[in-house]
Design a protein with these regions (language model features):
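Conserved glycine-rich Rossmann-like NAD(P)H-binding loop of the short-chain dehydrogenase/reductase
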Residues: 27-45
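Active-site helix of classical SDR
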Residues: 128, 162
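C-terminal helical subdomain
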Residues: 112, 186, 207-243
């Protein structure tokens, strides 16, 4: 008999952890929640807080060999993925180029700009591709994008580009999977109060204005779960970010970029 599971990447902290916490009290038809991230001890802490039976998969999802292990485990457990939630990712702020830290080569800084592309784009695509055969009618995919996907972001260039990829890929995938009744929701929050900024601001600072729109991970996840339930293709939390989304559709991007650059220079 197949086991119904929820699979969450980036589950050790932040939004991924919050998804595990909020989904745990529901879904009596779910047999296990699978938690995926690199830090085993952090995953164990999350698992200990859940009532559902859990499976900890401590792995680096940018490594193909480790994704093979995930596929093998899905086969061994005869898993049916009812929800795939891709939250693994990170961002780095600051001017692009060899300034601080020194991105002289991929080898010098494996967790730098190229690392964002590998994790935010390649790994998300790869894990989605591998998980699709284990999904069934009514399954859900939730992909963590960002409001940064709506517009190019100076001094956040690579991160914004990776999230634009996630949004575009996920919307297209959702159209492909409609006939199978598998539904994809892209979550596009603005700044969220998580450890994300501890990493992001090691190389630069965000606009002070953005921090005034910061919301809790609880609020973002609650909205995302609701939007996924109603089969919505996008989940945009908070009125300021919803207004920003409309703005990026109505106003030429260059005009908005000029304002962003002006505000950055005045800080």
């Amino acid at each position: 008999m197949r086991k119904n599971i929820i699979l969450i990447t980036g589950a050790s902290s932040g939004i991924g952890r919050e998804f595990a916490m909020q989904l745990d009290p529901y879904f009596s038809n779910i047999d296990e929640i699978w938690l995926v991230a690199r830090r085993k001890e952090k995953l164990a802490e999350v698992a200990s807080s859940l009532q559902h039976k859990t499976r900890i998969l401590a792995m680096d999802i940018t490594k193909e060999a480790q994704l093979e292990r995930l596929t093998d485990t899905l086969d061994d457990r005869k898993a049916c993925i009812r929800m795939l939630i891709n939250c693994a990712g990170y961002g780095l702020m600051g001017a692009f180029g060899p300034s601080k830290p020194d991105f002289r080569s991929e080898e010098d800084c494996p967790d730098g700009q190229l690392g964002m592309i590998r994790l935010n784009c390649e790994a998300l695509t790869h894990i989605t591709y591998r998980c699709l055969p284990y999904m069934a009618k009514g399954s859900r995919i939730i992909q963590l994008a960002s409001s940064a996907a709506f517009l190019p972001q100076p001094y956040f260039a690579v991160y914004a580009a990776t999230k634009a990829y996630v949004l575009s890929f996920s919307r297209a995938l959702g159209e492909e999977l409609k006939k199978k009744e598998i539904y994809v929701t892209s979550v596009c929050p603005g700044p969220v109060d998580t450890p994300f900024f501890e990493t992001a601001e090691k190389t630069g600072t965000t606009l002070a204005l953005k921090k005034y729109t910061m919301v809790s991970s609880e609020r973002v996840v609650e909205q995302a779960i609701r939007d996924s339930y109603y089969k919505r293709t996008m989940s945009v939390c908070s009125m300021p970010i919803q207004a920003f989304q409309v703005l990026t559709k109505c106003v030429p991007h260059q005009m908005i970029l000029n304002v962003m650059n002006y505000l950055k220079e005045r800080e």
